[in-house]
Amino acid sequence: MTEILPHVNDEVLPAEYELNQPEPEHCPGPESDMAGKSDACGGCANKEICESLPKGPDPDIPLITDNLSGIEHKILVLSGKGGVGKSTFAAMLSWALSADEDLQVGAMDLDICGPSLPHMLGCIKETVHESNSGWTPVYVTDNLATMSIQYMLPEDDSAIIWRGSKKNLLIKKFLKDVDWDKLDYLVIDTPPGTSDEHISINKYMRESGIDGALVVTTPQEVALLDVRKEIDFCKKAGINILGLVENMSGFVCPNCKGESQIFKATTGGGEALCKELGIKFLGSVPLDPRIGKSCDMGESFLDNYPDSPASSAVLNVVEALRDAVGDV
């Protein structure tokens, strides 16, 4: 028997704790053994709260590990800056993988304050149901399932205004309680930059194993500056970097097939950055205005425009990504 989950509210998702102010720089973390004790805690308005929180191993992590044990490959989609097409690429990656009928694919939207995967995957009006086996994800196709906070909002344009503790609790629920069953791939779309969501997902999934991160950028230096920070975060957090994809890399006219550079790579672009930092360059994807149209319609751009240079480029990136995780 299944039932529809109620909309997200304080009763359904109570905060584990509420801090008096956002965590300061060099904060050891409210749940760490050094919470309230480190040098960074001196004078912090949260000191007493952090000291009172329970310490020790998180009892939910074994449950998360068990729930995700049937998932073969787990991929984080990251970007240093917003607006580079990270969520768009996460959606196209999900469409591309699920085009193989032998693969079972899940898409988890962890951009909690700006969820967009449901719209791009064409299931914006769906709701989440709960059964004895947990939360049932929304199925886009027979072999593509998705989960997002968007399905739990009272209105499509309802704002999510949460601090880190409540975000962490929702991430735990998605990892621990969603009945993904057996998947070949779980694509995890994250917010831009490095935030609570990134730290939490790495902490909660460390034991279950993350194959690595796919980093999305655009060619211009202003985007690459933040990508360098994202890559540094991955290295410090012990997250394997599967590779980098340069999105919006030129514009190919659908009529004359001529190519123009809209966002010029003033410092060499993504490929040069990969050579500099010693990470894998998965490929470049050119601009195609029809990508945005397909996302707005909740349809697969790859199916709608298979002859587009952008479609070929995306499929090449997906092939390189599958090779990077050993799925050949």
Curated annotation (Swiss-Prot):
InterPro entries xrefs: Mrp-like_CS (IPR000808), Mrp/NBP35_ATP-bd (IPR019591), NUBP1/Nbp35 (IPR028601), P-loop_NTPase (IPR027417), YlxH/NBP35 (IPR033756)
Effect of C44 to A/G: Loss of function
Binding site for [4Fe-4S] cluster 2: C253, C256
Principal cellular location given in the protein's record: cytoplasm
Consequence recorded when altering C234A: Does not impair function
Outcome after substituting C50A: Loss of function
Family matches, as PROSITE patterns: MRP (PS01215)
Domain of life: Eukaryota
CDD domains the UniProt entry points to: Mrp_NBP35
Cofactor note: Binds 4 [4Fe-4S] clusters per heterotetramer. Contains two stable clusters in the N-termini of NBP35 and two labile, bridging clusters between subunits of the NBP35-CFD1 heterotetramer.
GO cellular component assignments: cytoplasm; cytosol; cytosolic [4Fe-4S] assembly scaffold complex; iron-sulfur cluster assembly complex; nucleus
Consequence when changing C253A: Loss fo function and disrupts heterotetramer formation
Family: Belongs to the Mrp/NBP35 ATP-binding proteins family. NUBP1/NBP35 subfamily.
Protein name: Cytosolic Fe-S cluster assembly factor NBP35
Originating organism: Saccharomyces cerevisiae (strain ATCC 204508 / S288c)
